[in-house]
């Protein structure tokens, strides 16, 4: 079984914010497979889907972003999933809006949810899909920016980026992280 964990914050006030793009990606995967989310044996929501005969656990931590590792560890323990079989999907302030980047390992890059997962796993060699949300203009507060919603023009790009991210996640499941990196790390932005 593979685990695809989309990071975000619970509560309706955070819905459709830049920081919750990970939730949007796992929501899209569930929608594509006509599945819905249920409460898990831990502080998370989950959905089980199958892609190319591979079972996938979709996960939305309900711990708030900065404690995402608690939910990921709980799901991995309960479902007996190894670190090599997880993909974490999160926002990235350093990548342009419309661009996604798959990585096999690495630092948190300033993303606190990813940082907490690395701390809880005590390793950084697990796959992650970074979804670009970088502003195209100066911002006075990055905290306010990531907790803000996309404007109408950004939303058009974001919708395509969420679809592309869902495709990349399924490619990871079917073919592995190296294959997904080769096919989705093109540096091209989703067209406006």
UniProtKB/Swiss-Prot annotation:
Keywords: Cytoplasm, Hydrolase, RNA-binding, tRNA-binding. It catalyses: an N-acyl-L-alpha-aminoacyl-tRNA + H2O = an N-acyl-L-amino acid + a tRNA + H(+). InterPro entries: Pept_tRNA_hydro, Pept_tRNA_hydro_CS, Pept_tRNA_hydro_sf. GO terms for molecular function: peptidyl-tRNA hydrolase activity; tRNA binding. The record marks 91 as: Stabilizes the basic form of H active site to accept a proton. It is found in: Cytoplasm. It is an enzyme of class 3 (hydrolase). The record marks 9 as: Discriminates between blocked and unblocked aminoacyl-tRNA. Pfam families: Pept_tRNA_hydro. The active site is at residue 19. GO terms for biological process: protein quality control for misfolded or incompletely synthesized proteins; rescue of stalled ribosome. One of its GO terms (cellular component) is cytoplasm. The keyword Ligase does not apply. Its EC number is 3.1.1.29. TRNA binds at residues 14, 64, 66, 112. Belongs to the PTH family. NCBIfam families: pth. Hydrolyzes ribosome-free peptidyl-tRNAs (with 1 or more amino acids incorporated), which drop off the ribosome during protein synthesis, or as a result of ribosome stalling. This is Peptidyl-tRNA hydrolase. It comes from Prosthecochloris aestuarii (strain DSM 271 / SK 413). The gene is pth.
